[in-house]
């Protein structure tokens, strides 16, 4: 894995982690992803930023251009010029903050002469009841490093090497209060503004296409429930046995991933006893559905036909051999009868 792949992989893991932390249906999120490299040989600028609303990329910025650039049609237009002015100013400020933090972390690691990467993810979620949750995390060289705790205004170190930076940043209470104000006030306000701009696009709801497939490998029978082409990505999938929930520990689930066309996909698999497939049902809940959708595995016509043909051939083969055996027995009986008559006649 190359140097650039490591921060990209780190961001992918962070996105999944944040999304997996209990996001309820119909919630919305605003995320900013920052990354940078101390040397150009990593293929990254000193600072690069990407902004997402509900996991839809809408803005990009880098240290060289120092300008916010649109990545979505719904934020284009002269009417939104004020938005881009504010975004550019905010990202310039984060550009400066990121570089200062980068040098601080490198100095605390005695890495000033080496090439390293820094990654940051920050943002907020607004739930259906208008409650909010903020997050602000740092990763260094592709590993979790520091996380801001807005409730206590301190930093949580993910590794021992981060303790020096943690103690240094916790002295600056002004910055901690500014961070909390952004996560709890500014970020939710900006998210609501962006949701208004993206009305009709961001609030669309495409229900999932759900199907259950059957797989047999190494004497293990597995049912796989697939949810395809849905939007937004908030979805709940569970297995039921005789209409009762199955323990989640028994199921294997896949993270919700983009399909490449603006929709999402996911699946959940469950190993079941052979012959009991019809006792299991996949239940799916999604904002695009008026009520939970259920699906079961239905044997395909081709499988039924093949089974019938094989069974028919087997029956025919059995009947054929029984017929041959019957004829052989008849011939033997006839031969024995003829021999008996011959002997009796000779005795007379």
From Swiss-Prot:
Alphabetized UniProt keyword annotations: Cell membrane, Disulfide bond, Glycoprotein, Ion transport, Iron, Iron transport, Membrane, Signal, Transmembrane, Transmembrane helix, Transport
Region of interest called Connecting peptide, as start-end residue ranges on this chain: 298-306
Span list, region Alpha-3: 206-297
Species the sequence originates in: Diceros bicornis (Black rhinoceros)
The protein's role, per its UniProt record: Binds to transferrin receptor (TFR) and reduces its affinity for iron-loaded transferrin.
Residue intervals annotated with topology Cytoplasmic: 331-348
Annotated spans, Alpha-1: 23-114
Assembly behavior: Binds TFR through the extracellular domain in a pH-dependent manner.
Disulfide-bond pairs as recorded: 124-187, 225-282
Residue span of region Alpha-2: 115-205
Pfam families for the chain: C1-set, MHC_I
Protein's name in the database: Hereditary hemochromatosis protein homolog
SUPFAM superfamilies reported for this sequence: Immunoglobulin, MHC antigen-recognition domain
Record's subcellular location: Cell membrane
GO biological process terms held by the UniProt record: iron ion transport; regulation of iron ion transport; response to iron ion starvation
């Amino acid at each position: 894995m190359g140097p650039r792949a490591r921060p990209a992989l780190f961001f992918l893991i962070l996105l999944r982690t944040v999304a997996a932390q209990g996001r309820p249906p119909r919630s919305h999120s605003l995320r900013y992803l920052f990354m940078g490299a101390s040397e150009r040989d990593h293929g990254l600028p000193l600072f690069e930023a990407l902004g997402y609303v509900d996991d839809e990329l809408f803005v990009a910025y880098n240290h060289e251009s120092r300008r916010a650039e649109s990545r979505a049609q719904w934020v284009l237009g002269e009417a939104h010029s004020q938005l881009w002015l504010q975004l550019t100013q905010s990202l310039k400020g984060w550009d400066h903050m990121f570089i200062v933090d980068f040098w601080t972390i490198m100095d605390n690691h005695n890495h000033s002469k080496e090439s390293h990467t820094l990654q940051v993810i920050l943002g907020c979620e607004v739930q259906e009841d208008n409650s909010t949750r903020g997050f602000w995390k740092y990763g260094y060289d592709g590993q979790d490093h520091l996380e801001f705790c807005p409730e206590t205004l301190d930093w949580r170190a993910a590794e021992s090497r981060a303790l020096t930076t943690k103690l240094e940043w916790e002295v600056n209470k002004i910055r901690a209060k500014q961070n909390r104000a952004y996560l709890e006030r500014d970020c939710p306000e900006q998210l609501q503004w962006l949701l208004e701009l993206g009305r009709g696009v961001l609030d669309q709801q495409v229900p999932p296409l759900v199907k259950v497939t059957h797989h047999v490998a190494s004497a293990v029978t597995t049912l796989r429930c697939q949810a395809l082409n849905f939007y937004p990505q908030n979805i709940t999938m569970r297995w039921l046995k005789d209409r009762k929930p199955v323990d989640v520990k028994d199921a294997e689930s896949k993270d919700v991933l983009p399909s490449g066309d603006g929709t999402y996909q996911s699946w959940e698999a469950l190993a079941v006893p052979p012959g009991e497939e019809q006792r299991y049902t996949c239940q799916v809940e999604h904002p695009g559905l008026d009520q939970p959708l259920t699906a079961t595995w239905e044997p395909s016509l081709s499988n039924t036909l093949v089974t019938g043909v094989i069974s028919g051939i087997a029956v025919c083969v059995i009947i054929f051999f029984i017929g041959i055996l019957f004829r052989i027995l008849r011939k033997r009986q006839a031969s024995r009868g003829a021999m008996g008559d011959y002997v009796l006649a000779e005795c007379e």
